[in-house]
UniProtKB/Swiss-Prot annotation:
GO CC annotations, alphabetized: cytoplasm; ribonuclease H2 complex
Any Pfam family hit: RNase_HII
Cofactor descriptive note: Manganese or magnesium. Binds 1 divalent metal ion per monomer in the absence of substrate. May bind a second metal ion after substrate binding.
Name of the protein in its database record: Ribonuclease HII
Cellular localisation: Cytoplasm
GO annotation, biological process: DNA replication, removal of RNA primer; mismatch repair
RNase H type-2 domain location: 25-213
Amino acid sequence: MRHKAHPGPDLELECALLRSNRAIKTLCGVDEAGRGPLCGPVVAAAVVLDLDNLPVGLNDSKQLSAKKREQLFEQIYVTSQVGVGEASVAEIDALNILHASMLAMVRAVTALQGRLVVDHALIDGNRVPATLPVPGQAVVKGDAKSLSIAAASIIAKVTRDRIMAELDRDYPHYGWAKSQGYPTQAHLQALALHGVTPHHRRSFKPVKQLLPH
């Protein structure tokens, strides 16, 4: 018997948690954007959805066009509670990208807690940050399973894309508004031609090998 492909994120995880644990009244989804780029911060978001007022068309950010992500970004901010956190390039280089991503997630949940009490977090990926201020559960490929995580993925992605578009204005040779800092051929060529900027991650190999020894 062939298994059907997962139809996309839904509220099964959220509803199961709310049913099984009466101590959980409010839960958030958490995701990050920007682990792979050669430059710019890593950004995380934590989102508590209003289960009775979900944004129409909510899906994993990777399945959406840039225009649809922008539309949903605005809808999520109107209908939901949102916290955003980031880790800087300096923190990425000092900690490594994994630990910097965990730090950004902790900051996002902490920011969200400034708005309301959060009892539980659904974290995209295979680990829960050690210093997360609330109990958490890791969900592998969570942005394709949980609508709360999918919403967080959209907030994190659009927030970071906007940051890279701003940086692109100061450093137009690198094409960051288009590539978001990922190691595209055009970005690598510009890096070799124009050099390393203060926004590049010096611990990442394509950048590190261009630094003076």
